[in-house]
């Protein structure tokens, strides 16, 4: 019985991984598409959370992932593409990938923006082959309510993250363990 469960689990993992690889290549967007979607996503975030605009004005870099797709049934994966902006200019393109295992089911899309508040945090991203959220510079995930309490004295973290525009149904959403890698566009 245990062997049957193990084989079924491994088969599921192989199928999910194979499907995810074909989906992620189909999801690959052009630089123009990423730029357009990132501009719209950032404008939407600034409209809903005015405090994010204040952070954006002080940030050394803003990494915008306008749309990330997460899907899973026991095994899960997520993928999205984004752009790093410094002083309003696009300076690099990145993808974010995560895999998970556990009690989960569903499909969801969402976006997130990382505000890099220090030069050292931006440098860490630039020199990393795969920047993993949760390792390296400190990251604070903010929602609309928590953003209202942010001041110049409390805002001392390396990176602030906002998750927004969640659509679909999936239990469990987080950034921990996401790997961010530079890509050519």
Please report, for each region that a protein language model flagged, where it lies by residue:
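C-terminal segment of classical bacterial N-terminal signal peptides
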Residues: 16-25
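Sec-dependent N-terminal signal peptides
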Residues: 5-17
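Small-residue-enriched, tightly packed secondary-structure blocks
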Residues: 27-185
